[in-house]
Amino acid sequence: MRSAGREPLPRRSPRWRRASPLCETSAGWRVSQLRRDDLRRPSTMKGKERSPVKPKRSRGGEDSSSRGERSKKLGGSGGSNGSSSGKTDSGGSRRSLHLDKSSSRGGSREYETGGGSSSSRLHSYSSPSTKNSSGGGESRSSSRGGGGESRSSGAASSAPGGGDGVEYKTLKISELGSQLSDEAVEDGLFHEFKRFGDVSVKISHLSGSGSGDERVAFVNFRRPEDARAAKHARGRLVLYDRPLKIEAVYVSRRRSRSPLDKDAYAPSSSVVGTSVGSHRHAPGGGGGQRSLSPGGAALGYRDYRLQQLALGRLPPPPPPPLPRELERERDYPFYDRVRPAYSLEPRVGAGAGAAPFREVDEISPEDDQRANRTLFLGNLDITVTENDLRRAFDRFGVITEVDIKRPSRGQTSTYGFLKFENLDMSHRAKLAMSGKIIIRNPIKIGYGKATPTTRLWVGGLGPWVPLAALAREFDRFGTIRTIDYRKGDSWAYIQYESLDAAHAAWTHMRGFPLGGPDRRLRVDFADTEHRYQQQYLQPLPLTHYELVTDTFGHRAPDPLRSARDRTPPLLYRDRDRDLYTDSDWVPPPPPVRERSARAATSAVTAYEPLDSLDRRRDGWSLDRDRGDRDLPSSRDQPRKRRLPEESGGRHLDRSPESERPRKQRHCTPSPDRSPELSSNRDRYNSDNDRSSRLLLLERSSPVRDRRGSLEKSQSDKRDRKNSASAERDRKHRTAAPTEGKNPLKKEDRSDGNAPSASTSSSKQKPPSQKQDGGTAPVAASSPKLCLAWQGMLLLKNSNFPSNMHLLQGDLQVASSLLVEGSTGGKVAQLKITQRLRLDQPKLDEVTRRIKVAGPNGYAILLAVPGSSDSRSSSSSATSDTAASTQRPLRNLVSYLKQKQAAGVISLPVGGNKDKENTGVLHAFPPCEFSQQFLDSPAKALAKSEEDYLVMIIVRAKLVNSG
């Protein structure tokens, strides 16, 4: 009769035989989702308890006998027929079966996404008995090794879905085998799990009761949801054709609600439970190393579980796998932010070669001011080579430099430095390789010393960061030359003009929350001479173009650049380096917008569009001028030839009146978004509306820029004709003696002491009036500011037409020093060869020299933009001027402001044997020091707060005497 009670069980044995391959290869991927969900829990325990190579059919008989033995034990001395046996099962063992059924329902609700059939539930709640009896029944009396542990393990496996204060960020991968090396396993697991989020892999050796240590891998995620998604999506994992076992390692953030968990946690472990094939015994043997049950006593947890199930408090089903956009947003395999990922390993048990992590090593790179792309490697083996280090570290990223320091006499330690391409690579290598054995020694890893450069690497970016936002945040620290960034990339490179600006951005932008509090930036220095390969290098945009994408779109594929320029593509980025300088935000003079008055202001309109064109495509670049030395006349010719056909066939050419309302709508929401340099914020006295109008005029369209260039060339021809006629008139006026007249009283005379200088200055003055004084207010202020010099200022391979007007001091000082040292004739160009930092002690020294020199020993001049044809009209132009590129004066002003320095020129040019007649010229950009020399007439002559230089000339003999 007892056999009748066991008769239905063999009919379920084929189900078990079919499930046994899952039990043996619990990490395989070749099983459907339904079978995986139905058989997850029984396959887990059976796969751990039995060897995968044992026969599968013997399992059914053993399950049947074990079930019979269990029914006898639970039934006590029940009846001998089938009905009495059934009553015994439902009566005497109601409590145990209720637990099994409830646990199976809980597991079914957690893992079955589409619902299961009744047969699957029947199979599920009978599985704990099978698992418990498979051990031979000897662990039945043990509270840790029998059904209590399996039930507690089953309950713990449902904990992640329930969220009862228990979560996991770590997956334990076991059954790795011994054929593959630790690095090969770590690298393979990293590539398998990196798509789910920020992940790190650590290999550990756990001491076991078998022949040796068991090698396991801990896959640590930054977020618990990433770990859950990886566990559900990678429930069946085959690595190198070897099925692996995946377990979740739970970390308790608060104590369990079990009534009997007073002594639940072992002092040496923070692991409270495992799922999906958890061990029945502790790795150390006997279960003394870690506790797999949150409750400490299996019976107490079972009572608590029954109580919770009776109240209907079942854990909710697990969340669905994260959307596939996760891979697109996290397509980089490095850390966004590192949590204490490896804190479990030393507690679980570390191998002999694994050094425990310290808390200082777990600081995220967003918070660690020492974090950079250079790693310090200590305790290296004396025989280590560069190839050894590259083999060990090249899987973490691109290694740019390896430096090994061999021990000298009296030293015993070998250390080295390893430089990666960026901070993400070095940080991941630091966490993964700290304590690893290379050759014979476990290495110690720390951060090296950062090497400041003008180029920054910025990490922690993503689709949420537009290019305009990146430029706006980093432009506060100085002038940006280029930004290499494509929206959606995880990193960017920002090139500054100065090292101070880059260092300030490196200091203040580390950890900056760009896009939210959990999206913080990582900043490090990068190599300036190395061009990193990217699929697309986007130039630094204009702010109003980026705010409205449809207007920004027509600038990126600019076909006119390739038609005009023949320079390499890398130079295009350099040409946009000055697009975000502060000089771009200067309000324009009103006559520029009145095209009807073009005849009266031909010289002004001639250089304003040229200024815009040069800033647009030939931005201020001192590094690339060797490859771009075309003369302005030759560069304007192709523009003239293309203009008629392009203006007739394209619709980009619009008048300023038609374009102004449309673009003002784009610019109106962005007054606060315009880039401002922190060092120059106090100098912006113009309102934002005027700044926006300047942008509209200068950034209208490429065709408008070329039309301005054509108008410039046409106006140059008219200027030459006018200057030729004016030249004849001035010859008659300058016949009278000019000595003894006050230069500040009479405009027609520029020098009261030197006749040759007077003649030269008077000849060159009317073009300056056309250039700088085309309006009535400027002409009215000209009598107070006589023209002292006209020519070219040179800096490296660029020349800047300028005119100098006397502000203070003696004009004789300027006339006697602004000459050729060898011939004594008037000099046509002044080359800046040195810079003077605008530090307060140095400014005080300049002030002291002016006071010591006295009223006849110095001259202060105001340099404003000169006419563009001054070089051609000057008879003393040299080969240096002919080989350089002409640029507007505001580019020189912007360069000096960005460098926070003044240009220095030794006078006279070329040196002088007469030591008594020497001096120094300082060219100061707009700053607090230079503002003290400007009065209202001088400001009216300058027309703009960002388009002038203050020149201070002091005689050297007076300097030496002071």
UniProtKB/Swiss-Prot annotation:
Feature: compositional bias, Low complexity: 82-94, 118-129, 150-159, 268-277, 754-771, 867-885
Biased composition regions of type Gly residues, renumbered to the chain: 134-149
Subcellular location: Nucleus speckle; Nucleus, Nucleoplasm; Nucleus envelope; Nucleus membrane
Region of interest: Disordered: 1-167, 257-297, 553-779, 866-885
Keyword Nucleus: yes
Source organism superkingdom: Eukaryota
An individual GO BP term: thrombopoietin-mediated signaling pathway
Record-linked PROSITE patterns: RRM, SPOC
Phosphoserine modified-residue sites: 108, 178, 207, 209, 252, 256, 258, 291, 293, 364, 621, 655, 670, 674, 701, 768, 782, 936
Modified residues (Omega-N-methylarginine): R577
RRM domain ranges (all copies): 169-251, 373-450, 454-528
PTM notes: Methylated at Arg-577 by PRMT1, leading to promote ubiquitination by CNOT4 and subsequent degradation by the proteasome. Ubiquitinated by CNOT4 following methylation at Arg-577 by PRMT1.
Start-end of Basic and acidic residues biased regions: 1-10, 34-52, 59-72, 97-112, 553-580, 612-661, 673-692, 701-729, 742-751
UniProt modified residues of type Phosphothreonine: T567
Protein name listed in UniProt: RNA-binding protein 15
